[in-house]
């Protein structure tokens, strides 16, 4: 019998801005840990809802929370802490994690969201259980010493038809503790092109963190 899943939608206040989020969690028992899902510029938390990622994570025993980033989706009214393509302060995502009471989470970070996740990942004493970058932007804005200092396990994901995925990998491969999932025939939002492969690879990585 499939495990039951509880889902909800709400907003949180982060640094004076209202951010929308969707959450799925196991219907019974404790969640293993939290997974925070970010998104690219043409997407929102709805992407993870429609793809079934939130549901699959909750069924596997994780608390999955997808936010709409400032200025996008249903957080359109919120002011972003940095212009698009510039690194946001790591304190922004730290404040999101605090507001949602996630504990040390795994962060899934495609494309645009790299501007938020990379400063959080490389901040001294970063409370991050795992990192799943999917062809994120801003990888060239982090220096080698900062990459080398990251102890967080990472699963680097990209489609082999995505030049940006290859470019970001050239930087991300400096993370000392990483695995790579290259999706053949997939483009920039590779998780949309190959959802089954995405979910299998993601759940496998998360299981290794338990």
UniProtKB/Swiss-Prot annotation:
N-acetylalanine found at: 2
Source species, domain of life: Eukaryota
Top-level EC class as recorded in UniProt: transferase
Entry EC no(s): 2.3.1.-
Residue numbers annotated as active site: 111, 162, 188
Keyword field contains Phosphoprotein: yes
Catalyzed reaction equations: L-lysyl-[protein] + acetyl-CoA = N(6)-acetyl-L-lysyl-[protein] + CoA + H(+)
A GO term for molecular function: protein-lysine-acetyltransferase activity
Listed InterPro entries: AB_hydrolase_1, AB_hydrolase_fold
Major site of localization recorded for this protein: cytoplasm
SUPFAM superfamilies: alpha/beta-Hydrolases
Residue positions where Phosphoserine is found in the record: 91
Gene Ontology process terms (BP): positive regulation of transcription by RNA polymerase II
An example Gene Ontology CC term for this record: nucleus
Pfam families: Abhydrolase_6
Complex formation: May interact with TAF1.
Entry similarity comment: Belongs to the AB hydrolase superfamily. ABHD14 family.
Function: Acts as an atypical protein-lysine deacetylase in vitro. Catalyzes the deacetylation of lysine residues using CoA as substrate, generating acetyl-CoA and the free amine of protein-lysine residues. Additional experiments are however required to confirm the protein-lysine deacetylase activity in vivo. Has hydrolase activity towards various surrogate p-nitrophenyl (pNp) substrates, such as pNp-butyrate, pNp-acetate and pNp-octanoate in vitro, with a strong preference for pNp-acetate. May activate transcription.
Listed name of the protein: Putative protein-lysine deacylase ABHD14B
Species whose genome carries this gene: Pongo abelii (Sumatran orangutan)
